[in-house]
């Protein structure tokens, strides 16, 4: 089950499309869907988590806590909407594209992809690009 939780004044439009997309990404990696919670927050909220649990005193766009059991994906993905907006401006991409990239970044970590080395980061970016193409908005 994929759920969205909002700690700020923000809400995803077309939640079902996003849920279906995340599910399809998980299946495309030969994993099964467990419980994934997205928590959308602001910089201060995520900074507190970064300091408390990871001992990092920096702003970040996403932090994911992986509770996966074998091939069943479980976890909490915290996303700073402020950071995503700023990154979208910096990278000159639409906000929703950057949001989807960050959302799927956490899931890809659960699937085993890393981003610590340059080679890992290149593979992660390539996988993000691949998975962004799987997103479809259902037309009524």
UniProtKB/Swiss-Prot annotation:
Q: What is its main location?
A: cytoplasm
Q: Which Pfam families match?
A: YbeY
Q: Record's InterPro entries? A: MetalPrtase_cat_dom_sf_prd, YbeY
Q: Tell me, what is an example of a GO biological process annotation in this record?
A: rRNA processing
Molecular function GO labels: metalloendopeptidase activity; RNA endonuclease activity; zinc ion binding
* Leader peptide range in chain numbering: none
Q: What is its EC number?
A: 3.1.-.-
What cofactor does its activity depend on? Zn(2+)
Return the broad EC class. hydrolase
- In the UniProt record, which is one GO cellular component term? cytoplasm
Q: What keywords tag this UniProt record?
A: Cytoplasm, Endonuclease, Hydrolase, Metal-binding, Nuclease, Ribosome biogenesis, rRNA processing, Zinc
State what this protein does: Single strand-specific metallo-endoribonuclease involved in late-stage 70S ribosome quality control and in maturation of the 3' terminus of the 16S rRNA.
Give the family from UniProt: Belongs to the endoribonuclease YbeY family.
The molecule here is called: Endoribonuclease YbeY
Q: Which organism is it from?
A: Flavobacterium psychrophilum (strain ATCC 49511 / DSM 21280 / CIP 103535 / JIP02/86)
Q: What is the lineage of its organism?
A: Bacteria, Pseudomonadati, Bacteroidota, Flavobacteriia, Flavobacteriales
Gene symbol here is: ybeY
